[in-house]
Amino acid sequence: MKKVIALVLLVALVISLVACSTAPASPTSSAAKDTKDQLYIEVSALGNLDYFYDHKLGMKKVGEDLGVKTEYVGPAEYDMNAMVAAFEQAIAKKPNGIVVVGFEDSLNPVVKKAQDAGIPVVTVDADLPASGRIAFVGTGNKNAGIMGGEKLAQLIGTKGKVAIMTKPGQSNLEERVAGYKEALKKYPDIEIVQIVDTKSDPVVAAQAAATLLQKYPDLAGIACVEAAGGSGAATAVKEAKLQGKVQIIAMDRGNDVVQAIEDGVISASVAQQTALMPYYATQILYNLANSKVDITTDNKAAGVQGIPAVVDTGVIIVDKTNAKYFMRQAK
């Protein structure tokens, strides 16, 4: 009888231990309830460009993975006044954090306004270091330009005339242009003949590239540091029937660029891992709200935020060897 009682007690003890060990995994835990209503918003412009599909994808994915609400807002065109208005509307929603593409310094005041209201802001893609933002997540832009410059130099046999297509005034693009210049200056037989404004518009870029080809009939290469440039340059080179004669280095991995690589019109593209930018920016904001790392005995008193200040999401060279893996499926 004593053995039976002992066995019953042992079984009861095992059951209670198992129940205790599995309890924290319950989906109805207080942590899950606390975060499911949290809201994180990305504010951008140029939402009509294929490039920003990956921004939207990154925000959607991080929301699903963290179990929080996410939104992507902002104008379809390059309109800073409309973007500021979208940012103001985002502040009014009192989100747990805001992710913003730092196109221009004109965004600094509204970023500071959010910070002053207790809403932390992380910049992505292009930085606003004077805005008071808590972190930047994006490409090491100068290094991206250096990689593109080295690739272009090899494609043209380290000699010849080249042009660079950009949108002046954006800090991230200026850094890429600086990277191209640094890479190409190592080759004395390469001359940068002109830097052209695309206005981040594929149609304008195509017209600008066509003018370049007429002005410099011996042009060896075109370097593009933003998404519209590659598409426009490809259109102009194809219409002039100069595929293979004028080497194009594009930027990023829109389907039109990837197809042009497979068709032999664009030689290669420097592709950012764009979806990682809003993904990790939101992760930083989420951690700031929910899971602080004790860097010191008192982070707040010590002036320590306990988050990375800069995250480099890196770039990948896309060419004929790997282009097929970058083609997006139908949205």
Which residues does each predicted region cover?
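Short, solvent-exposed amphipathic alpha-helices that sit
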Residues: Y51-L66, A144-G148, N172-I190, A208, ...
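Extracytoplasmic "Venus flytrap"
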Residues: D37-L66, E71-V84, V101-D105, M165-E175, ...
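Short beta-strand elements in bilobed, periplasmic/extracellular small-molecule ligand-binding domains
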Residues: E64-E77, K161-T166, K181-P202
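Flexible loop/hinge segments that line or gate small-molecule binding clefts
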Residues: E104-N143, M147, Q154, K161, ...
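Hydrophobic alpha-helical
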Residues: E88-A92, N96-Q115, Y180, T198-A260
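Hinge/cleft segment of the Venus flytrap/periplasmic-binding protein
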Residues: K33-K36, A183-L184, Y280, I284-K331
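Short, low-complexity disordered leader/linker segments with a strong preference
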Residues: M1-L39, E64-D65, K112-I119, K324-Y325, ...
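Hydrophobic alpha-helical segments within soluble ligand-binding/sensing domains
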Residues: M83, V137-V162, E174-E175, V204-A206, ...
